[in-house]
Amino acid sequence: MTGDRPTGKLHLGHYVGSLKRRVELQNSGEFDKIFIMIADAQALTDNADNPEKVRQNIIEVALDYLSCGLDPEKCTIFIQSQVPELCELAFYYMNLVTVQRLQRNPTVKQEIQMRGFSDDEENQNKKGTPVGFFTYPISQASDITAF
């Protein structure tokens, strides 16, 4: 299972970094099933102010997948928000992870800084960290373990 967040058009870096390998895997016969997710719900965690952009990019990403050689006859391409069980599973997982553990996650800490989020009283000019963004790793875990 793999996927992309539809935050913009895919580019050469996506092709070299993962799309080429996905096409090779789909054609290798090595796996019975290959699932490729367009992670629109995760894209909203830091694009909630522009859901139309995410919606439009779902179409762009799907077209890019097809143009790179991904074949819907050989792999399952799906949109994250269209599988409600993923959200349900993430909700259950959220009861197994503490806020403190998420706060210690180096990737979460780095992403919060990069996006200018802050829950610190001294940084009132910055916007707070959205809960959906903060719990992004839990959502990813549910996506992976569901498949």
Q: How does the language model describe each region?
A:
Residues M1-F147:
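NTP-dependent nucleotidyl-transfer catalytic core
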